[in-house]
């Protein structure tokens, strides 16, 4: 570790507020020194750490010293109940040694101070701490001595209390601070054990782009707490937990609760457990289906829907982003690249004019000897005429017309002012000017036009200032973190080669291209970004907590747009920690490449921008976080007992405007530097305050977390299991009488109409079944379109005729003979001299022979011209049941066995919701 002095968090359980450990540089031995933190490291609330002050949160019993009484260290004189391990052999990180520390900042401390770094369990215990020979060693630190049964009894009591209070937790990953703070609250850990031969499912990073906004497997794609990619830590806090459990009590209690249900689960990735199998009172630190904003592809897609959720423009805080694997996005990106190049030409003209006016004649004469001959020849080799500026002006003018919706009548597939071939030539000349140093010729008249159009574009293009004039874009994998696979490019053909050369790599939108911020805010000529934490405790209503403390990460190289190497433009600590600082780097920059937000605020005051943090930066970051969550609220699986801590990365423009780059799930909590050692431990402690302490006490201290957004609750109707069921049967096609045969078993009485005849498919006769359906349909259509005058029926009670689009109302039935078929068993027999009907109605457009006492009620609104349905007749039941969903038939009477009319039995009212219509079901009659 470098620097004059560096702060080191010793242990979350051994330090109080405002304490840190320092090491004086240049010392050959380990010389860590404890002193108070500087004022800029403190916050405005009372205690930096949530150490329990009440007896309920403290450890219920005091753990006994495992060794003999003669080797027991004395209690510290500070007045608290913490044990003094000063008699233990000191070591620095992995080596155990003892040394005297000089005073702070060069002063001499007469009293020797030993480091409190405990030995690991792999190291042998000192002779003074070895158990007696007559004792049985159960495991490291726990011996079956005189007080063995008492420790077991106390551990059992503590476990029973934790089980009763539902204070069982389970952790997957390296979270020593969480373990320590939960143990202080009386929680007992249940070890997460995986069966031999099984492993956690690897995160699936290559999925369909359509699923990236909803998938369960991609929400944690930007997690940085992966065991395989763990950052180097300034201090391994797991050693302190092992030393704190030197007597084995916590290991014993973990074994006691191995069959208990954990009520707090803290994991690195969400896919470790399936939330669907958790009970309602089990808390977990992840939400399912959060990939809609924790992946670059999901954030790119969902922020486009922001106008539907809020009156805001995503282009004002999120750089333009496209998916290279999607054809629509690819086409939009190409057009955006063209227009950006045209705007950059206008900027170059204005910049060259300002430069020519600012340079004096004397300065030009002084620079003339420095201009070597090759440079003059290079300028003469390539010269771009003023026509190139006219093309750029015309393209920008057409773009303004398109934004104003003046191109409504234009073909959407037509090119933007220039054809694709012309745009290709335009880009080649643009590359010559920007990248190869060609000379751009322009006219004085063109300068004023460029300024006017740029002023108009300023009002409609929010990213005009930050995009610069070199047209640099950054290509990123859709679901990766820590800067893996990121490339900065400035040529369109090179970016499109990623799609053409490797289609499998770009399939389904796995890669995105985003506009690079060419004019970022710099500190001492170096680029930086900011990591901001926020906590989501509910999605309905959406509840967001914003952390007041943050940290910034510097690059190791000076900023330059001519060098597109990742060491210059990517500030991820996972990349920069492997690089050496440039010799041209400003000496005021920190050696560990990190500042706290308090130090950044002090720098803003030094550069005469004291209000930039409170008036521009913080409000902009809060708004960006809220908008990103609003657009993803419908995609995330809401679970009341879940919560999640996210880390957002921001880059600032020259006007201090924050630009959201990405949002990471499971942000790293590794104490890689002195800044992260303090802040990462603090954000974990304050997270437990919000999700655990606040559930019991709504007015408790939430640390540095601030509630910035909470929606009104939206009630979701509960599913009660109601099934919508529609019952019924199809209406049989009527059977014309002219084609019936004697002895044919039929389920309907044979009818005769004025239009032709045809046998029903249900008549049972193979001969008549072969009748053409096409002819029957043609007859029906002919009957519908051209009804005969004699077949027109008047509307009951009115003098008007029924409209022709009701074909059944224009059909008039004729009796073939004074005979009718009567059912006897399964054979139809003829009955003579009985008149059974005069009119009939059918929904199929053909007449049916019906009884004179039948009525048909329409359950749907009729045609406007037909205000009342006429009286209609229905045949009696002839050995079948007819159930109709379109027409309701109410039968009031029937024919007796001898042909006389009889009264029908009263029909009971049906229960609502069980019939075929909204009022009552179809009735069944008996003949």
Swiss-Prot record:
Enzyme class: ligase
Keywords: ATP-binding, Cell projection, Cilium, Cytoplasm, Cytoskeleton, Flagellum, Ligase, Magnesium, Metal-binding, Microtubule, Nucleotide-binding
Any one GO cellular component localisation term in the record: cilium
InterPro entries tied to this protein: TTL/TTLL_fam, TTLL_monoglycylase
Region (Disordered): 35-113, 194-227, 735-799, 897-927
Positions with biased composition (Polar residues): 35-47, 752-769, 916-927
EC numbers: 6.3.2.-
Residues that coordinate or bind ATP: 476, 482-483, 514-517, 527-529, 571-572, 662
Subcellular localization: Cytoplasm, Cytoskeleton; Cell projection, Cilium; Cytoplasm, Cytoskeleton, Cilium axoneme; Cytoplasm, Cytoskeleton, Flagellum axoneme
Ligase is among the record's keywords: yes
Regions of compositional bias (Basic and acidic residues) in chain numbering: 776-788
Superkingdom assignment: Eukaryota
Domain TTL intervals: 345-702
Main location: cytoplasm
Domain notes: Two conserved structural elements specific among monoglycylases, IS1 and IS2, are involved in glycyl chains initiation. Two conserved structural interfaces likely constitute the binding platforms for tubulin tail and microtubule. Arg-482 is the main determinant for regioselectivity, which segregates between initiases and elongases in all tubulin--tyrosine ligase family. A glutamine residue at this position is found in elongases TTLL6, TTLL9, TTLL11, TTLL13, TTLL10 and favors glutamate-chain elongation, whereas an arginine residue is found in initiases TTLL2, TTLL4, TTLL5, TTLL3, TTLL8 and favors initiation.
PANTHER family reported for this sequence: TUBULIN MONOGLYCYLASE TTLL3
Protein name: Tubulin monoglycylase TTLL3
């Amino acid at each position: 570790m470098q620097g004059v002095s560096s702060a080191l968090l010793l242990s979350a359980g051994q330090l109080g507020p405002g304490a840190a450990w320092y090491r004086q540089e240049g010392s050959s031995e380990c010389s860590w020194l404890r002193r108070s933190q500087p004022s800029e490291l403190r916050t405005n609330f009372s205690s930096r750490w949530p150490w329990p002050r009440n007896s309920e949160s403290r450890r219920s019993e005091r753990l006994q010293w495992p060794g003999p009484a003669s080797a027991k260290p004395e209690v510290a004189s500070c007045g608290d109940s913490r044990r003094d391990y000063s008699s233990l052999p000191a070591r620095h990180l992995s080596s155990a040694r003892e040394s005297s520390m000089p005073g702070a900042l060069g002063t001499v401390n007469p009293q020797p101070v030993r480091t409190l770094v405990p030995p690991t369990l792999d190291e042998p215990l000192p002779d003074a701490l070895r158990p007696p020979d007559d004792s049985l060693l159960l495991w490291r630190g726990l011996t079956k001595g005189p007080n063995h049964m008492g420790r077991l009894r106390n551990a059992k009591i503590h476990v029973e209390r934790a089980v009763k209070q539902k204070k069982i937790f389970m952790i997957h990953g390296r979270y020593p601070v969480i373990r320590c703070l939960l143990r202080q609250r009386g929680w007992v850990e249940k070890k997460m054990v995986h069966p031999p031969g099984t492993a956690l499912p690897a995160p699936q990073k290559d999925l369909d782009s359509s699923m990236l906004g909803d998938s369960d497997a991609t929400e944690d794609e930007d997690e940085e707490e992966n065991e395989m990619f763990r950052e180097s830590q300034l201090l391994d806090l797991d050693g302190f937990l092992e030393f704190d459990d030197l007597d084995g009590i916590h290991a014993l209690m973990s074994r006691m609760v191995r069959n208990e249900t954990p009520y707090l689960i803290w994991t690195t990735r969400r896919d470790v457990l399936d939330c669907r199998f958790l009970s309602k009172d089990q808390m977990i630190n992840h939400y399912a289906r959060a990939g809609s904003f924790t992946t670059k592809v999901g954030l790119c897609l969902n922020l486009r829907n922001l106008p539907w959720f809020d009156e805001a423009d995503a282009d004002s805080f999120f750089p333009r982003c496209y998916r290279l694997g999607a054809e629509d996005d690819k086409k939009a990106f190409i057009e955006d690249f063209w227009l950006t190049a045209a705007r950059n030409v206008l900027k170059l003209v204005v910049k060259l004019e300002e430069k020519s006016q600012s340079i004096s004649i004397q300065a030009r004469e002084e620079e003339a000897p420095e201009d070597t001959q090759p440079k003059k020849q290079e300028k003469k080799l390539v010269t771009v005429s003023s026509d190139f500026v006219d093309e750029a002006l015309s393209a920008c003018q057409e773009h303004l017309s398109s934004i104003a919706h003046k191109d409504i009548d234009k073909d959407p597939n037509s090119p933007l002012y220039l054809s694709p071939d012309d745009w290709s030539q335009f880009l080649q000349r643009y590359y010559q000017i920007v990248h190869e140093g060609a000379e751009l010729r322009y006219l004085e008249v063109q300068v004023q036009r460029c300024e006017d159009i740029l002023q108009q574009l300023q009002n409609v293009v929010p990213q005009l200032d930050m995009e610069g004039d070199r047209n640099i874009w950054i290509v990123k994998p859709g679901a990766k973190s820590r800067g893996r696979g990121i490339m900065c490019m400035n040529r369109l053909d090179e970016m499109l080669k990623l799609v053409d050369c490797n289609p499998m790599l770009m399939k389904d939108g796995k890669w995105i291209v985003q506009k690079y911020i060419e004019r970022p805010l710099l500190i001492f000529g170096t680029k930086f970004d900011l990591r901001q934490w926020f906590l989501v405790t509910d999605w309905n209503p959406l509840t967001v907590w914003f952390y007041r403390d943050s940290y910034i990460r510097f690059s190791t190289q000076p900023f330059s747009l001519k060098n597109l190497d990742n060491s210059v433009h990517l500030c991820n600590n996972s990349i920069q920690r492997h690089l050496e600082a440039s010799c041209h780097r400003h000496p005021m920059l920190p050696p560990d490449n990190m500042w706290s937000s308090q130090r950044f605020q002090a720098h803003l005051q030094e550069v005469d921008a004291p209000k930039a943090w409170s008036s521009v930066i913080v409000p902009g970051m809060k708004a960006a976080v809220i908008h990103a969550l609003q657009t993803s609220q419908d995609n995330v699986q809401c679970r009341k007992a879940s919560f999640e801590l996210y880390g957002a990365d921001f880059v600032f423009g020259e006007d201090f405007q924050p630009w959201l780059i990405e949002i990471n799930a499971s942000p790293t909590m590794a104490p890689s530097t002195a800044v992260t050692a303090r802040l990462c431990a603090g954000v974990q402690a304050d997270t437990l305050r919000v999700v655990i302490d606040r559930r019991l006490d709504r007015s408790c201290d939430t640390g540095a977390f601030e509630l910035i957004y909470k929606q009104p609750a939206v009630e979701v109707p509960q599913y009660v299991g109601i099934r919508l069921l529609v019952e019924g049967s199809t209406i049989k096609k009527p059977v014309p009488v002219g084609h019936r045969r004697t002895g044919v078993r039929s389920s309907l009485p044979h009818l005769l109409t004025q239009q032709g005849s045809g046998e029903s498919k249900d008549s049972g006769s193979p001969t008549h079944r072969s009748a053409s359906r096409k002819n029957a349909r043609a007859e029906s259509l002919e009957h519908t379109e051209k009804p005969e005058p004699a077949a027109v029926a008047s509307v009951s009670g009115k003098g008007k005729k029924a409209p022709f689009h009701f074909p059944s109302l224009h059909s008039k039935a004729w009796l073939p003979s004074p005979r009718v078929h009567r059912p006897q068993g399964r054979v139809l027999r003829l009955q003579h001299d009985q008149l059974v009907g005069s009119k009939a109605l059918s929904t199929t457009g053909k007449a049916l022979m019906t009884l004179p006492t039948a009525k048909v009620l329409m359950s749907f609104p009729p045609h406007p011209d037909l205000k009342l349905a006429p009286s209609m007749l229905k045949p009696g039941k002839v050995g079948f049941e007819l159930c109709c969903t379109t027409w309701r038939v109410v039968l009031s009477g029937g024919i007796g066995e001898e042909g006389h009319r009889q009264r029908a039995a009263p029909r009971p009212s049906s229960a609502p919701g069980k019939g075929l219509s909204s009022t009552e079901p179809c009735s069944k009659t008996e003949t």
